[in-house]
Amino acid sequence: SSEKIADDLDAALSEVSSAQHNLEGRLRVASLSGSFADQVVGPAMNEMAALHPNVEIVIDFNARQVDILSEGYDFAIRAGPMQDSGLIARPLTSRTRVAAASPEYLASNGKPLHPAELKDHQCILTHSNKWRFTEKGKLLDVAVTGRLNLNSGQAILDGCSRGLGIAYMAIGGFGKTLSDGTLTPILNDFWHTDRSIHILRPDRRYTPRRVEVAISILEAFAERARAHEIQTIRALL
């Protein structure tokens, strides 16, 4: 339940904060941008700042792949497959990708019932022209096309809401548009979930306590956000 989630978060935060009032120094983090950054990373690091007033926090919200070691970051938050970089990769959370379109788009273009039918639709792309779905427990990669290619979740959401095509992105990026009827979820049986967000940090013998505490807070916020996502998904299915 949402009450249990809130209680668990409070317990986790009190645990990481109780003995840590003397933390100090600088915390430097590189984070992916987008809905996860806005809904989880930013609030978690603001919580860190509120709990530990002697810690200076610098967060770089950026899509580029930083060099953690040479650029002096304590850790990075990244999505997608992890390359073997000599860094420690720690899974942070899973994400479920959801396909959706506006009622107007579906009325004009029809509603695809299988991912293979997306070849006949305008898909709003980001980075890749392949979308990954799951069919009966197996991965299904589908080539898609579209005249919009956007690397901003907000821009994708706006274009989708205006009937310009089908969006397929992490459920957190849709905000309230799925529950309030602005957008209609489609291909519900094929949505793909992967453990795609990781914390990357240097492989050091000694990790400063402020870094360990920041990661603990981040994990608590990510767990709460994921639990809310699962509730939202269940309500849509």
Regions found by a protein language model. Name each.
Residues 86-97, 101-124:
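Flexible hinge/capping segments at coil-to-helix
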Residues 1-21:
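Alpha-helical "hinge/linker" immediately C-terminal to small N-terminal DNA-binding modules
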Residues 56-61, 125, 143-152, 190:
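Short beta-strand-to-loop elements that line the ligand-binding cleft
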Residues 89-92, 145, 181-192:
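Short beta-strand->loop
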Residues 75-78, 165-169, 185:
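Paired acidic/hydrophobic, glycine-rich loop segments that form the ligand-binding mouth/hinge
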Residues 119-140:
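Secondary-structure junction motif
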Residues 25-88, 231-235:
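Central regulatory/effector-binding core of bacterial HTH transcription factors
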Residues 17, 50, 54, 171-180, ...:
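C-terminal effector-binding regulatory domain of bacterial HTH transcription factors
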